[in-house]
């Protein structure tokens, strides 16, 4: 299991940050959270934001509106992830909303992404082919919003052990390590 966060940038593009530890992910998340507005009566129309424990019991209610964009630009979000020694991945670049491609109309060459994510549906439809020319490693995931969706996306990894550092090496294809979506 890798610790991670998904940031909605000021351009409303999603960026996935994966980290070596939960502490690093939490630190990055707190920096993002500090830029988000508080929950108001109007924002409550978007629904409740409960904090649940492992047994499904409500423990608290989130006071920050998590469904809005952070004030970080795309470059700043990637910089934040990297400042916590994380991997920055352009989320679901094949989707028509909240992707770098849909929001900017092109893939920025000046942003230091470690990989791109293709949605699991996009993989099934062969959309990954149009992004291979970007020269970045590809991953896929379930991008789950419901429990039933967990596990829909799969990648194959060739690594020496199951660790964050080995995953990073697989993305970079170092010494025979590999990451593939198909």
Where are these regions (language model features)?
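Short acidic/polar alpha-helix capping motifs at helix-coil junctions
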Residues: 39-45, 89-94
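Surface-exposed cleft-lining segments at the edges of enzyme active sites
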Residues: 56-69
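Internal active-site segments that recognize and position negatively charged phosphoryl groups
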Residues: 71-81
